[in-house]
Amino acid sequence: DDSASRGLGDVYKRQYHRLSHRVRFLWAVHMSHHSSEEMNFAVSFRQAWFGPISKVPFFMIMPIMGFDPTIIAVAGVVSTLWGIVGHTQIVGKLGPLEYIFNTPSHHRVHHGSNPQYIDKNYGNLLIIWDKMFGSFEPEKKPVVFGLVNNVNTFNPIKITFMGWMAMLKDMRNSLSYKESLKIFFGPPNTKTRSGSF
């Protein structure tokens, strides 16, 4: 059934997005998207250079799991278009749509560096998954956009590699190979959620 495939695909994309915030090497890829201190349509195009490389292994599994490649492609286009619309401060709350969809309000929360907004609202098209998994947070207080400690640069090279540089530095300073692996695959902490290295 196509609608079941779309629903499962949406939760699958949500899980990948969550991993992009909870696994440090994936956060090193994704954090450039969150480094903007503004929230507007242009932020949706501020994508990681290595994002496609990190997504390929994850999303290649979908056809193996039985997802129709055509539906995956169409869902990818819809998701991209919805993602552009979601990066705005122009659109306020959308009434009953807020209960089901990942609206601009919900996505503003996701881009917030306010403590109560960190690691919230990973949803792709639907916000119901975040409500089910306990990662939902409504927009209540004004959102402070950007990283915990912002990058203070517009240099795209620095923005792209800042997470990698900080992670590699921590790995170099680790006491063992096992500790290095924990740094690479472990969660980012407050320090590594920043743009300083």
Positions of the model-derived regions?
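Transmembrane alpha-helical core residues of multi-pass small-molecule transporters
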Residues: G9, H33, V78-W82
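Cytosolic/stromal cytosol-facing helical appendages immediately following the last transmembrane segment
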Residues: E38-A42, V85-F197
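Juxtamembrane helix-capping/reentrant segments at transmembrane boundaries
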Residues: M31-Q47
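Juxtamembrane helix-loop transition segments at the membrane interface in multi-pass membrane proteins
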Residues: Y16-H33, E98
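Core segments of transmembrane alpha-helices
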Residues: A48-I61, G123
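Single conserved hydrophobic/aromatic residue that forms the stacking wall/gate
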Residues: D1-Y12
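Alpha-helical transmembrane segments of multipass membrane proteins
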Residues: V56-I64, T80-I84, I128
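Transmembrane helix interruption/hinge and helix-loop junction motifs
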Residues: I64-V74
